[in-house]
């Protein structure tokens, strides 16, 4: 029997927190983590880049289509 499984059977020492469960509990927590990156996208992705950016410089009205 490996030592790690023996240690996990013992109660944690008084100064040490028990290890967290491996899988996240509850649907809400998992959904909230999955939805986190959406508000951050406009900060680090330019609205127009490459050919779109050059086309917007030539014809500014195309930007709002």
UniProtKB/Swiss-Prot annotation:
Bias (Pro residues) occurs at 10-23
Q: What is this protein called?
A: Uncharacterized 7.3 kDa protein in 100 kDa protein region
Q: Where is this region: Disordered?
A: 1-30
């Amino acid at each position: 029997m490996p030592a790690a499984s023996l240690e996990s059977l013992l109660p944690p020492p008084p100064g040490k927190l028990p290890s967290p469960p491996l899988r996240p509990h509850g649907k809400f927590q998992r959904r909230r983590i999955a939805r986190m990156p959406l508000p951050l996208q406009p900060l680090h992705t330019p609205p127009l880049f490459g050919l779109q950016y050059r086309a917007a410089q030539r014809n500014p009205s195309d930007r709002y289509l």
